[in-house]
Amino acid sequence: SRPLVAGGICVDERAHTVFVNEQEVQLTLKEYQLLCLLMKNRGAVLTRDVLLENIWGYNNESETRTVDVHIRTLRQKLGADGALIETVRGVGYRMGEHT
């Protein structure tokens, strides 16, 4: 399978690696799964509920902060390219087209 690419972010699912501008970035399993899901659905808004269901295996309104915290740490680890993960206020997140 081909790598997932967005901006300077490159995810190789077979090798389970993430590179940002050719530097390897260490992500937790949940951060990695979040990034893959967002990149595979690039341009589409994914609600917090959809993210919870797909990554954590449950859907609970009171747990949406879990998603927000993971998105925040994921953005930090991705550096400037973290800005590609856009917040859609009151809805969820999407992987944007450009930085």
Task: Outline where the language-model segments fall.
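Positively charged, aromatic-enriched patches within helix-turn-helix-type DNA-binding elements
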Residues: 15-82, 87-91
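C-terminal edge and immediately downstream basic/flexible tail or linker adjoining helix-turn-helix-like DNA-binding
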Residues: 94-99
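Basic, amphipathic DNA-recognition helix from helix-turn-helix-like DNA-binding domains
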Residues: 1-5
